[in-house]
Amino acid sequence: MKITVAKHAGFCFGVKRAIDIAEHTALNGKTYVYGQLVHNERVIDDLKKKNIIFADNIEEIPKNSVTVLRAHGEPGTTYEELKGKNIENEKLNDATCPLVTLVHNVVIKLKNNGYEVIIFGKRDHPESIGTSYHIKGKDTFIVESPDDASSVIEHINKNKFEKVAIISQTTMSVDGYKKLIN
């Protein structure tokens, strides 16, 4: 039997980049990673063998520790909390995916231009949480499924928004997004 591996098999470039940043940082000693870099236990176990310690919350990270932020992006409050632990500048390696950063920049520009921004994503996913922060609203409307399109329309009509933009968490389905906006 012949097995062919897809040309684009493996991690997306944002996750690959985050793993590379964590591994490179850990060459200089103990490194904390805030959150999961990747949803793959084998890879996490391999990284733990390389001076990398994963922290699910900031309280687990000691003051003055070298820290890497995951690819999903973080709300500004994360940076503020880390700064309070003297974790900034050369002690902080931000591995946010460039595509996620691009979404954050687009969202800021849309909000500054008077748009109500709706997120197509998972409410509890770090990327949607971080994007929501950049919209500057705890009441950011997040729709998780294209089947919830009626709730989006209801939200728009109820609030009488003049300009609306719907953006997507980068890991959501393109087909789902198209279904939602149509």
Q: How would you label these PLM feature ranges?
A:
Residues 1-182:
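The feature marks the mature, well-folded catalytic cores of soluble enzymes
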